[in-house]
């Protein structure tokens, strides 16, 4: 099975990427490679992958824009689409991890019926409108939460494959101390809620992730930094592993409707229970009383932390390995690729 992957350009596709989608894709390609797939990746040239890498840009767009070497992402994305069109005939499946931007590939004669679009981000009304115009796209979402919306909009070929991680790359820790928050520092991710919970409970908190909303950071995070509450910036895989494994509980007070919530299973892989708002796909991921707890409202979160500390960390690790290890996820994708192949015979 020969697969052409279209990866995001914002960050390198790498296990140490700052973006969750890029981290996930790097792991998926490794797992598919073990199943015998021959993978080619269209992504930034600083990506790290066992796939044949076709550089769309020499470095990721965030780095290029920071250095004032790029300004408008659309031109680089158009170049990626052009490269995909030039190479598409060589592959059994063209797997796009982009949205929006390349749905037009599905309209190209001879290759369109072999294009799979994976929807990683939340489904908004504009995408629902688009699906009503194009209901026969091959789609997969990373949660039933997303799929329900697309099917309601008329999607006829919409499948669910949950996100996954290489569980073995995370170190199981039989115990932890304090709280951890990992995510973008912006209102939708709720880092300010995590700070408030830590202060209310008198527990130490370590926050990590890129600062997107500098005003929020300056007003609601920075004034509380000190011995109890620390901010350590953007973390790589090893640092993430250490952060999540050392915590007694991971706080994920996401205000927005998460398409999946990858950090939740990364924490669980370390044995760390999760306390989160029951938004988006998180009710599909967190098993209350087993791997963590979910709250309907922000004000209910703090009361769930102490019960979460009593959960069996070894069982948490076992559950995430059984449900979300990349070996399991890659198997689901391979079956979907084969289904696309059968439909095109």
Q: Model-found features: residue ranges?
A:
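Catalytic cores of nucleotide-sugar-dependent glycosyltransferases that transfer UDP/GDP/TDP-activated
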Residues: 1-345
């Amino acid at each position: 099975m020969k697969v052409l992957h279209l990866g995001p350009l914002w960050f390198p596709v790498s296990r140490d990427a700052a973006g969750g989608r890029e981290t996930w894709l790097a792991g998926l390609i490794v797992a598919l490679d073990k199943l015998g797939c021959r993978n080619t990746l269209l992504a930034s040239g600083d990506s790290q992958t066992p796939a044949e890498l076709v550089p769309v840009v020499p470095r990721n767009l965030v780095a290029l824009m920071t250095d004032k070497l790029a300004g408008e992402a659309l031109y680089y994305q158009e170049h990626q689409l052009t490269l995909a069109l030039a190479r598409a005939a060589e592959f059994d499946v063209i797997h796009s991890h982009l949205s929006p931007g390349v749905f037009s590939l599905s309209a190209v004669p001879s290759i369109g019926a072999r294009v799979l679009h994976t929807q990683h981000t939340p489904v908004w009304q504009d995408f629902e409108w688009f699906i009503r115009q194009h209901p026969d796209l091959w789609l997969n979402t990373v949660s039933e939460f997303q799929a329900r919306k697309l099917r309601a909009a008329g999607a006829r070929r919409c499948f669910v494959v949950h996100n996954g991680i290489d569980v073995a790359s995370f170190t199981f820790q039989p115990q932890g101390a304090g709280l951890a928050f990992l995510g973008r520092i912006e209102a939708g991710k709720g880092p300010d809620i995590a700070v408030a919970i830590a202060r209310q409970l008198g527990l130490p908190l370590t926050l990590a992730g890129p600062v997107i909303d500098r005003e929020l950071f300056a007003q609601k995070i920075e004034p509380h930094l000190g011995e109890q509450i620390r901010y350590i910036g953007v973390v790589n895989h090893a640092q993430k592993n250490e952060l999540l494994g050392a915590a007694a509980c991971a706080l994920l007070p996401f205000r927005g409707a998460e398409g999946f919530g990858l950090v939740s299973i990364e924490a669980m892989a370390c044995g760390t229970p999760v306390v989160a708002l029951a938004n988006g796909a998180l009710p599909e991921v967190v098993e209350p009383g087993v791997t963590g707890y979910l709250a309907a409202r922000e004000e209910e979160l703090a009361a769930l932390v102490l019960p979460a500390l009593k959960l069996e960390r070894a069982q948490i690790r076992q559950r995430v390995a059984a449900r979300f290890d990349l070996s399991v996820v890659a198997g689901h994708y391979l079956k979907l690729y084969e289904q696309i192949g059968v439909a095109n015979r």
